[in-house]
């Protein structure tokens, strides 16, 4: 009876086709776990965010104290807040691993799925930035002032856009109110895009590590991969609990424990760690407009990846030179993240310029050239 119901009921049938009887390649590895982990962490972020919003006061005079009140007076408020703030870090760590897996195994050849994912990444970064502003601490205030002021670099309309976003001549109560509304709204838009992402994914099926035909050997998603996803969820929950309970302030900035003061500038303004790679690229270009364009290009360049795939082989599993270039790109990304957290002085300025240039050269020039070169080598007979 249950077997027939899940295949005939209009709603259960969708769940069955997506999570139970979904034909899945038999050889996908743990690297394919991050999709389900991202869905889980997104739901954790939405649920904890809704509970935090119940006690948040979007006013420049009471926002900081309302966050402190939530942590001190609300039943388990400290735990919910710790889950939300550290959950964002876990979320972005999984996102970067998910993107890295897509680059390594050429999942970007599903253009629709990949492009929706890149749009989700941009909206997630926008959502996280607005969320970072809400506590109205010292780093929140000055981070909002610096980043939003970058839009003034847009020719002709930049000086008009910035006061419109601020709701006045500077970052003020109207800015906080707008960011609160958008921070609450955007996760639900991201959730809709996630469903679109899954629809495109299930339309063509998942890639596999060997790059073989997707129809060669398939098994049902349940119970084989649901058990693997449950194990991944347990490990992810362990990481989140460790951060939330033992090291809740590890990934935060001490400056943000001080209420916002427009009359005192922090010695070093920097965003959260998951923005540091883009922040390093922004700082490495002395021209304001050039820096803004480079910062946004560091994200939207991912949209070009499918068009830069020149090799006839899909994954990098059998392409040792491409593997070397891939890990060079990963190390370059980590170097940019490290540089973005350092002060703007020597030698970090020069290092930032070198790593920023290498980031774009690797993606736009070296990877396509190496793919074309690999086409001239002898291909294994089963590719």
From Swiss-Prot:
Residues that coordinate or bind heme b b562: 84, 183
Gene3D superfamilies xref list: Cytochrome Bc1 Complex, Chain C (1.20.810.10)
Entry's Gene Ontology molecular function annotations: metal ion binding; ubiquinol-cytochrome-c reductase activity
Residues the record lists as binding a ubiquinone: 202
Key word Kinase present: no
Cellular component, GO annotation: mitochondrial inner membrane; respiratory chain complex III
Residues spanning the membrane: 34-54, 78-99, 114-134, 179-199, 227-247, 289-309, 321-341, 348-368
Chain residues that bind heme b b566: 98, 197
Membrane protein topology class: Multi-pass membrane protein
Entry similarity comment: Belongs to the cytochrome b family.
Protein task: Component of the ubiquinol-cytochrome c reductase complex (complex III or cytochrome b-c1 complex) that is part of the mitochondrial respiratory chain. The b-c1 complex mediates electron transfer from ubiquinol to cytochrome c. Contributes to the generation of a proton gradient across the mitochondrial membrane that is then used for ATP synthesis.
Name of this chain's protein: Cytochrome b
Source organism per UniProt: Caiman crocodilus
């Amino acid at each position: 009876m249950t077997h027939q119901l899940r295949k005939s009921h209009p709603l259960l049938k969708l769940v069955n086709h997506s999570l139970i009887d979904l034909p899945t390649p038999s050889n996908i590895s743990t690297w394919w776990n991050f999709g389900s982990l991202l869905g889980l962490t997104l739901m954790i972020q939405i649920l904890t965010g809704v509970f935090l919003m119940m006690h948040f006061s979007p006013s420049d005079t009471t926002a900081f104290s309302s966050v402190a009140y939530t942590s001190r007076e609300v039943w388990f408020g400290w735990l919910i807040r710790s889950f939300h703030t550290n959950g964002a870090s876990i979320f972005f760590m999984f996102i970067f691993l998910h993107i890295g897996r897509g680059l390594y195994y050429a999942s970007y050849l599903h253009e629709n799925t990949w492009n929706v994912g890149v749009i989700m990444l941009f909206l997630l970064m926008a959502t996280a930035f607005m969320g970072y502003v809400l506590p109205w601490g010292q780093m929140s205030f000055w981070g909002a002032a610096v980043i939003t002021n970058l839009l003034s670099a847009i020719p002709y309309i930049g000086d008009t856009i910035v006061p419109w976003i601020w709701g006045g001549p500077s970052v003020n109560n109207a800015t906080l109110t707008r960011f609160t509304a958008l921070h609450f709204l955007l996760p639900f838009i991201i959730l809709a895009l996630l469903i679109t992402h899954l629809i495109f994914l299930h339309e063509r099926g998942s890639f596999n590590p060997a790059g073989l035909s997707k129809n060669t050997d398939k098994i049902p998603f349940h119970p084989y991969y649901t058990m693997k996803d449950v194990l991944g969820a347990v490990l992810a929950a362990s990481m989140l609990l460790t951060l939330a309970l033992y090291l809740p302030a590890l990934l935060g900035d001490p400056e943000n424990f001080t209420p916002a003061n427009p009359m005192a500038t922090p010695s070093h303004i920097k965003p959260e760690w998951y923005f540091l790679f883009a922040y390093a690229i922004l700082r490495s270009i002395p021209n304001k407009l050039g820096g803004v364009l480079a910062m946004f290009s560091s994200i939207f360049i991912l949209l070009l990846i499918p068009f830069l795939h020149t090799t006839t082989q899909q994954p990098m599993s059998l392409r040792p030179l491409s593997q070397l270039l891939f890990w060079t790109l990963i190390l370059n990304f980590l170097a940019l993240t490290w540089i973005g957290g350092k002060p703007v002085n020597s030698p970090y300025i020069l290092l930032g310029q070198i790593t920023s240039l290498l980031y774009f050269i690797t993606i736009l020039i070296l990877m396509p050239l190496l793919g074309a070169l690999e086409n001239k080598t002898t291909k294994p007979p089963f590719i």
